[in-house]
């Protein structure tokens, strides 16, 4: 109690006393292997006053000695002891002038150690064998102990009836193939240990290994390939222990007794001398060698007849693999090894087996192999990224005894530079990589056999970046000059390569008089021609990677293409040449158009026949005729099936396929199913009107417009009934509200929509009245401009599949797809109040929405914020149940209607309107302030990463979207801290107390510990009930 009180008082003094001192470096929590050294750093930014530093260990002042001492402001501990040094360390900075004190946050020290391991039997019966690996050790805050199980030196993994569950080994329905010696190993940063004693499991045999036969009866040669069923008496307990003993004169004189130690690569032999009486020479007797309980080699000593029966069966656990190094001599029973390898180490035993008798076994002998010292694998040179937080170079060595691994730096100074260390496994770790880390490093492995070394070259590089990227489009007139800039920085200095329409440009394949490649990377084109128009790409690269930017060159012609008339016959000749050229070109165009029309007619006729056959197979179901055949012309971007949720509703018969096989039919069958899906979504482009561009997204422009009411189809009855039943099962049905959007009735609508019953209401009647009234539907249109960009096309297809597969009131509807021509249009549901973020800013007074004679809408109440969060959680739960992920959940990607209904949408205006909320990371625009750490580090998107983003959305709601998450940090700092796991999150001040714990759990680094959307919905439901009271 006294120590805790002292710590509390020290922290209170630090928070109360005014001081200009702030910590520039605070002590960090660390995990260290026992007997290694550790350093806690502490430094204040107050350079104008004299400061005194003290250290506390578990709220007690540290008594310094030779092992624990303070150098400057830093604390050094040599030879860390787990019994004395574990705990919290606090740095106290005292201003000697003012007497003010400031305490750093506590830093935890965890000690990693590993002593022993043992195998414990938890349960054994005929249905299950349960073993546990008990380990004396700890791994601190790093990765947990790694447990491996072995059966007779064979490593086990989860397969068939074997299950590995943390420290436990479970074998379901154990049989004879599971017999053997079970041992376990444990490893962490402190080393690796194996259990000294294992557990031997031996199953019982249910019948005698004997077949009835008459006297002097000879078996056919092919009988050795037959399989015989051996069934014992029901309820009987006969086994190997009930077999009669072999005759006393059949015995093993000398076996592999004792322990043999052999160097790797040397020959050796194991002795098994036996005595075989003359009266048993005609009997079937077998000599066997076993290694760790498994059959290794066997040979027949008696009669030539094959041995049949369980006792002579090698079984599934045999090691009878082809190995020319092993020879079993029949004359004296010796097992010889031509060359010993490390895997030959183990326990060996020889046996004599007489038919229908218990085996005779020798005493076991131990063979130990002195493994040759070597690197596994050989260390290799590596390029390290400048300013990388952590970089590792591995060096693993094997040998007997276990070698010690250390690193040195070549040159005059062999010691390692600062921020470079070696862990217990021999891995060279670089922290905060800088240019001083460049050089040659040598890994030394040493044991009693000697020393080996391997040298690697470490090069510190800088990823190439554009200092002056190409900006476009560039417009120039014919005969003019075009200059496209492209300058880059990096280490090594990046090379710059230009290409036109994905074809590389160089001085060898261009006109040197017109094309100039400047030393700084700029491309200059003089006397520009019409054929120079196109897409130009600049690629920069070095050993650290590649980057590319595109720019469009547009050439404007100055005339109509005809040369002016000249005097005499020259002008006439030029005019005649132009007329002939235009005539030939027109004839060619007419021919091409005719061929295209003819091919389209043939394609539509073939498709009609296939649909007729599919209709007959499906029982007369009418084929989809949307688009009048235009959907059959597939763009390359939408010709592939990329999601398992897209399933075709009809299949063509084999005869129909064979009857219309052409040169392209084989290639088109693979995309028939996905093409059928897109045909069902087909919408005519003429049905869209009043398109207004609101921004640009990741693959094109984004518009708001109207869709003709005749083209709007209501959701299927099945989906509506399912959603209605789901809603009623939780909270019942509720009332309805008005659709007016005036400010005078706005507050009443929002107050009437804060209960769960009103949120769960599905306004089916109002939707039907809206559709029957003939009013055009307000829609969001996303254009696919980057048709040749595979990444953009893949994301376009993913969003299509996501919105097509979900029918839920909390997710916007997908009305269809316009793909008659480029660009393709994705048509989504939109609302009269637009995106949720603009609505929040308006209610917070950040956006001027007031008109004459009216006032701005008031801020949302806590009940209304909970209502919005609940609806978003329900929509995301529907996405999760459809086995999809959103990947960009934020208030900017949700929409809200005048009925206070919130839906999850996908505008993703990342190029202009909300560009400051996105950051280009690894050549991809990402909402890094909403992304989970695993998305930034490993590009891994799951439902748990959507849970992380949902926590940020709730943070936005309670802050009225007036500020960005971690707006005090730059984008690069957010990425760096997220990768390092040091980005700290806290809930908004207005968050109810009942939600704080579950919202904080949304941001934990381990995805498995985050809640589900159903759990979040339940918590929000309770919070809403409390708020209503």
Curated annotation (Swiss-Prot):
<dbReference type="GO" id="GO:0038023">
    <property type="term" value="F:signaling receptor activity"/>
</dbReference>
<dbReference type="GO" id="GO:0004672">
    <property type="term" value="F:protein kinase activity"/>
</dbReference>
<keyword id="KW-0472">Membrane</keyword>
<dbReference type="GO" id="GO:0048804">
    <property type="term" value="P:imaginal disc-derived female genitalia morphogenesis"/>
</dbReference>
<feature type="glycosylation site" description="N-linked (GlcNAc...) asparagine">
    <location>
        <position position="425"/>
    </location>
</feature>
<dbReference type="GO" id="GO:0031290">
    <property type="term" value="P:retinal ganglion cell axon guidance"/>
</dbReference>
<feature type="disulfide bond">
    <location>
        <begin position="133"/>
        <end position="184"/>
    </location>
</feature>
<dbReference type="GO" id="GO:0010976">
    <property type="term" value="P:positive regulation of neuron projection development"/>
</dbReference>
<dbReference type="GO" id="GO:0007155">
    <property type="term" value="P:cell adhesion"/>
</dbReference>
<keyword id="KW-1133">Transmembrane helix</keyword>
<dbReference type="GO" id="GO:0090090">
    <property type="term" value="P:negative regulation of canonical Wnt signaling pathway"/>
</dbReference>
<feature type="glycosylation site" description="N-linked (GlcNAc...) asparagine">
    <location>
        <position position="520"/>
    </location>
</feature>
<feature type="domain" description="Ig-like C2-type 5">
    <location>
        <begin position="464"/>
        <end position="554"/>
    </location>
</feature>
<dbReference type="GO" id="GO:0035260">
    <property type="term" value="P:internal genitalia morphogenesis"/>
</dbReference>
<dbReference type="InterPro" id="IPR036179">
    <property type="entry name" value="Ig-like_dom_sf"/>
</dbReference>
<comment type="subunit">
    <text>Interacts with plexA; component of a receptor complex that mediates the repulsive signaling in response to Semaphorin ligands.</text>
</comment>
<feature type="domain" description="Ig-like C2-type 1">
    <location>
        <begin position="21"/>
        <end position="104"/>
    </location>
</feature>
<comment type="function">
    <text>Acts as a calcium-dependent, homophilic cell adhesion molecule that regulates neural recognition during the development of the nervous system. Component of the repulsive Plexin signaling response to regulate motor axon guidance at the embryonic stage. Also component of a receptor complex that is required in the adult visual system to innervate the lamina layer; specific targeting of R1-R6 axons.</text>
</comment>
<feature type="disulfide bond">
    <location>
        <begin position="486"/>
        <end position="538"/>
    </location>
</feature>
<feature type="domain" description="Ig-like C2-type 2">
    <location>
        <begin position="105"/>
        <end position="195"/>
    </location>
</feature>
<keyword id="KW-0812">Transmembrane</keyword>
<feature type="glycosylation site" description="N-linked (GlcNAc...) asparagine">
    <location>
        <position position="440"/>
    </location>
</feature>
<dbReference type="Pfam" id="PF07714">
    <property type="entry name" value="PK_Tyr_Ser-Thr"/>
</dbReference>
<dbReference type="InterPro" id="IPR000719">
    <property type="entry name" value="Prot_kinase_dom"/>
</dbReference>
<dbReference type="GO" id="GO:0050839">
    <property type="term" value="F:cell adhesion molecule binding"/>
</dbReference>
<feature type="domain" description="Ig-like C2-type 4">
    <location>
        <begin position="364"/>
        <end position="459"/>
    </location>
</feature>
<dbReference type="InterPro" id="IPR003598">
    <property type="entry name" value="Ig_sub2"/>
</dbReference>
<dbReference type="GO" id="GO:0051897">
    <property type="term" value="P:positive regulation of phosphatidylinositol 3-kinase/protein kinase B signal transduction"/>
</dbReference>
<dbReference type="InterPro" id="IPR011009">
    <property type="entry name" value="Kinase-like_dom_sf"/>
</dbReference>
<dbReference type="GO" id="GO:0017147">
    <property type="term" value="F:Wnt-protein binding"/>
</dbReference>
<dbReference type="GO" id="GO:0046982">
    <property type="term" value="F:protein heterodimerization activity"/>
</dbReference>
<keyword id="KW-0677">Repeat</keyword>
<keyword id="KW-1003">Cell membrane</keyword>
<protein>
    <recommendedName>
        <fullName>Tyrosine-protein kinase-like otk</fullName>
    </recommendedName>
</protein>
<dbReference type="GO" id="GO:0030424">
    <property type="term" value="C:axon"/>
</dbReference>
<dbReference type="GO" id="GO:0048803">
    <property type="term" value="P:imaginal disc-derived male genitalia morphogenesis"/>
</dbReference>
<dbReference type="GO" id="GO:0005886">
    <property type="term" value="C:plasma membrane"/>
</dbReference>
<dbReference type="InterPro" id="IPR013098">
    <property type="entry name" value="Ig_I-set"/>
</dbReference>
<keyword id="KW-0325">Glycoprotein</keyword>
<dbReference type="GO" id="GO:0007169">
    <property type="term" value="P:cell surface receptor protein tyrosine kinase signaling pathway"/>
</dbReference>
<feature type="disulfide bond">
    <location>
        <begin position="272"/>
        <end position="350"/>
    </location>
</feature>
<dbReference type="InterPro" id="IPR007110">
    <property type="entry name" value="Ig-like_dom"/>
</dbReference>
């Amino acid at each position: 109690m006294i120590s805790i009180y002292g710590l509390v008082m020290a922290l209170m003094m630090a928070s109360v006393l005014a001081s200009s001192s702030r910590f520039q470096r605070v002590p960090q929590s660390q995990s260290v292997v026992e007997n290694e050294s550790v350093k806690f750093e502490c430094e204040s930014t107050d350079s104008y006053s004299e400061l005194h530093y003290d250290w506390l260990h578990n709220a007690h002042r540290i008594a310094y000695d030779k092992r624990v001492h303070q150098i400057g402001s830093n604390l050094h501990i040599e030879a860390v002891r787990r019994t004395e040094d574990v705990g919290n360390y606090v740095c106290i900075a005292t201003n000697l002038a003012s007497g003010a004190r400031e305490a750093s946050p506590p830093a935890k020290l965890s000690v990693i150690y590993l002593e022993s391991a043992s195998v414990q039997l938890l349960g054994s019966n005929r249905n299950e064998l349960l073993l546990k690996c008990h380990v004396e050790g700890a791994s601190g805050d790093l990765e947990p102990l790694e447990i491996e199980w072995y059966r007779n030196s064979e490593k086990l993994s989860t397969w068939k009836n074997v299950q590995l569950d943390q420290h436990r080994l479970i074998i379901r329905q154990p049989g004879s193939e599971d017999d053997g010696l079970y041992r376990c190993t444990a490893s962490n940063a402190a080393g690796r240990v194996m259990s000294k004693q294992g557990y031997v499991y031996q199953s019982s045999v249910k019948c005698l290994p004997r077949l009835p036969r008459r006297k002097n009866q000879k078996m056919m040669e092919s009988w050795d390939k037959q399989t015989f069923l051996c069934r014992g008496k029901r309820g009987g307990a006969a086994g190997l222990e009930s077999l009669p003993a072999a005759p006393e004169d059949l015995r093993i004189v000398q076996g592999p007794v004792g322990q043999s130690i052999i160097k790797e690569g040397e020959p050796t032999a194991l002795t098994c001398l036996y005595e075989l009486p003359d009266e048993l020479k005609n009997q079937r007797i077998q000599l066997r060698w076993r290694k760790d309980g498994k059959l290794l080699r066997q040979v027949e000593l008696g009669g030539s007849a094959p041995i049949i029966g369980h006792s002579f069966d090698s079984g599934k656990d045999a090691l009878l693999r082809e190995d020319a190094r092993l020879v079993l001599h029949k004359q004296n029973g010796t097992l010889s090894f031509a060359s010993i390898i490390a895997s030959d180490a183990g326990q060996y035993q020889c046996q004599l087996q007489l038919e229908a008798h218990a085996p005779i076994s020798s005493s076991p002998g131990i063979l130990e192999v002195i493994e040759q010292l070597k690197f596994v694998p050989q260390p290799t040179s590596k390029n390290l990224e400048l300013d990388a937080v952590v970089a590792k170079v591995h060096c693993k060595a094997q040998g007997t005894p276990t070698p010690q691994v250390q690193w040195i730096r070549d040159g005059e100074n062999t010691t390692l530079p600062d921020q470079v260390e070696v862990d217990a496994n021999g891995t060279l770790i670089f922290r905060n990589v800088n240019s001083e880390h460049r050089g040659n490093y040598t890994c030394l492995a040493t044991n009693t056999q000697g020393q080996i070394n391997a040298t690697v070259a470490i090069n510190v590089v800088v990823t190439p970046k554009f200092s002056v990227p190409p900006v476009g489009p560039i417009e120039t007139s014919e005969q003019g000059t075009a200059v496209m800039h492209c300058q880059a920085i990096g280490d090594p200095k990046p090379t710059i390569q230009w290409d036109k329409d994905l074809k590389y440009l160089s001085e060898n394949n261009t006109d040197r008089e017109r094309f100039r490649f400047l030393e700084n990377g700029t491309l200059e084109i003089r006397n520009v021609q019409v054929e120079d128009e196109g897409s130009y790409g600049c690629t920069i690269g070095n050993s650290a990677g590649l980057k590319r930017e595109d720019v469009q060159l547009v050439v404007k012609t100055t005339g109509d293409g005809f040369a002016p008339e000249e005097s005499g016959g020259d002008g006439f000749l030029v005019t005649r040449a132009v007329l002939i050229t235009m005539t030939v070109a027109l004839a060619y165009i007419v021919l091409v158009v005719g061929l295209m029309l003819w091919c389209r007619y043939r394609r539509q006729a073939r498709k009609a026949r296939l649909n007729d056959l599919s209709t007959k197979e499906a029982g007369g179901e009418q084929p989809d005729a949307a688009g009048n055949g235009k959907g059959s012309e597939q763009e390359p971007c939408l010709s592939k099936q990329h999601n398992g949720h897209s399933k075709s509703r009809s299949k063509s018969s084999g005869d129909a396929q064979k009857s219309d096989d052409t040169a392209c039919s084989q290639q088109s069958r693979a995309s028939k199913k996905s093409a059928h899906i897109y045909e069902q979504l087909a919408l005519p482009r003429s049905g869209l009107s009043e398109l207004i561009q609101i921004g640009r997204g990741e693959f094109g422009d984004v518009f708001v417009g109207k869709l003709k009411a005749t083209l709007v189809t209501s959701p299927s009855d099945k989906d509506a009934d399912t959603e209605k039943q789901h809603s009623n099962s939780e909270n019942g049905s509720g009332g309805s509200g008005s659709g007016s959007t005036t400010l005078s009735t706005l507050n009443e609508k929002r107050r009437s929509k804060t209960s769960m019953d009103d949120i769960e209401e599905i306004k089916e009647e109002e939707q039907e009245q809206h559709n029957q009234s003939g009013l055009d539907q307000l829609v969001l249109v996303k254009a696919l401009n980057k048709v040749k960009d595979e990444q953009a096309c893949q994301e376009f297809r993913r969003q299509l599949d996501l919105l097509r597969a979900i029918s839920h009131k909390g997710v916007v509807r997908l009305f269809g797809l316009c793909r008659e021509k480029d660009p393709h249009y994705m048509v989504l549901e939109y609302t009269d109040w637009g995106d949720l973020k603009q609505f929040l800013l308006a209610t917070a007074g950040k956006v001027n929405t007031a008109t004459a004679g009216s006032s701005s809408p008031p801020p949302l109440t806590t009940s209304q914020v909970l209502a919005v969060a609940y609806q978003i959680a329900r929509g995301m739960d529907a996405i999760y149940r459809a086995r999809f992920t959103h990947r960009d959940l934020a208030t900017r990607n949700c929409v809200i209607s005048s009925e206070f209904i919130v839906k999850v949408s996908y505008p993703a205006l990342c190029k202009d309107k909300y560009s400051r909320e996105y950051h280009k990371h690894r050549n991809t625009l990402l909402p890094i302030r909403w992304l989970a750490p695993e998305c930034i580090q490993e590009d891994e998107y799951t439902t748990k990463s959507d849970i992380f983003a949902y926590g940020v959305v709730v943070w936005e709601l309670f802050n009225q979207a007036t500020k960005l998450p971690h707006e005090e940090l730059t984008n690069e700092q957010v990425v760096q801290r997220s990768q390092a796991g040091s980005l700290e999150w806290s809930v908004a001040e207005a968050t109810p107390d009942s939600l704080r714990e579950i919202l904080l759990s949304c941001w934990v680094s381990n995805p498995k510990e985050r809640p589900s959307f159903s759990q979040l919905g339940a918590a929000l439901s309770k919070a809403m009930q409390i708020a209503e009271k």
